[in-house]
Amino acid sequence: MSAVTLLNVGFDNVVIAERVIAVAAAEASPIKRLREAASRHQKLIDATNGRRTRAVIVTDSDHVILSSLQPSTLAQRLQELTARG
């Protein structure tokens, strides 16, 4: 069985790093529409712990995960996990 790599998205919430397709800033209009569509299809996961949403993570299962961390922080964490292999 292979080891699973977990990406910390804030407040002790984690996502399987291999399933992440995109990390985007939450303010863009297309991302807001994506967020609304995910909510309608019950594929929206709020991992902000009541804080302001700064990043939106899209997974290969079409789930949209909201994070209060900056997109650059999440991207850096993903790069570090990928570099470790």
Give short role names for the model-derived ranges.
Residues 30-49:
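Compact, glycine-rich, soluble single-domain proteins
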Residues 56-85:
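C-terminal structural segments of small proteins and small subunits
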